[in-house]
């Protein structure tokens, strides 16, 4: 039984197939210029899509989607894009479609980015209702993180040291008023404080 060498297989291909493979390989290595806007960007996953409206300075009849990864964004700090943000970019064709290789703002400026940040585990469930420190009343931390020594006990509703929240007259009077008139969501979340 004879064996067939690799030379015979590749040498046996018609020239047109070899040329087609070379053209496909060179097409993937070409870098193109484009501009458009951010279609969407997932800040938690770090990727999204751009809507290309111009290729090599020429308007496109129909917009084309181009994949973008956060590692390709030209900007300081946390890398992300805002929906609708104008961008200029270079891109290449890959086996998966069009992929950006570098993304900037107009004129090569840094990208603006999204105001959104991914939620960090532990902070998702925390501070949803305006939680405050039970020790000092601060809004920026909880009692276990408080830098002050333990404070005297006081009402968590009105901050008075004369009673606790269960016996708070301010809370009782507010509850009576609430039954009489409807309130907005803002009033519901922020209790009035007395000194």
Swiss-Prot record:
Monomer. SUPFAM superfamilies: Nucleic acid-binding proteins, Retrovirus zinc finger-like domains. It comes from Xenopus tropicalis. Residues 182-195 have a biased composition (Acidic residues). Keywords: Cytoplasm, Endoplasmic reticulum, Metal-binding, Nucleus, Repeat, RNA-binding, RNA-mediated gene silencing, Zinc, Zinc-finger. InterPro entries: CSD (IPR011129), CSP_DNA-bd (IPR002059), Lin-28_RNA-binding (IPR051373), Lin-28A-like_Znf-CCHC_2 (IPR054081), NA-bd_OB-fold (IPR012340), Znf_CCHC (IPR001878), Znf_CCHC_sf (IPR036875). GO terms for biological process: positive regulation of cytoplasmic translation; pre-miRNA processing; stem cell population maintenance. The gene is lin28a. Disulfide bonds: none annotated. RNA-binding protein that inhibits processing of pre-let-7 miRNAs and regulates translation of mRNAs that control developmental timing, pluripotency and metabolism. Seems to recognize a common structural G-quartet (G4) feature in its miRNA and mRNA targets. 'Translational enhancer' that drives specific mRNAs to polysomes and increases the efficiency of protein synthesis. Its association with the translational machinery and target mRNAs results in an increased number of initiation events per molecule of mRNA and, indirectly, in mRNA stabilization. The keyword RNA-binding applies. It is found in: Cytoplasm; Rough endoplasmic reticulum; Cytoplasm, P-body; Cytoplasm, Stress granule. GO terms for cellular component: cytoplasm; cytoplasmic stress granule; nucleolus; nucleus; P-body; rough endoplasmic reticulum. Its main location: cytoplasm. This is Protein lin-28 homolog A. A zinc finger (CCHC-type) spans 131-148, 153-170. Zn(2+) 2 binds at residues 155, 158, 163, 168. Belongs to the lin-28 family. Residues 98-126, 175-195 are annotated as: Disordered. It comes from the Eukaryota. Residues 33-106 form the CSD domain. Zn(2+) 1 binds at residues 133, 136, 141, 146. Residues 107-130 are annotated as: Flexible linker.
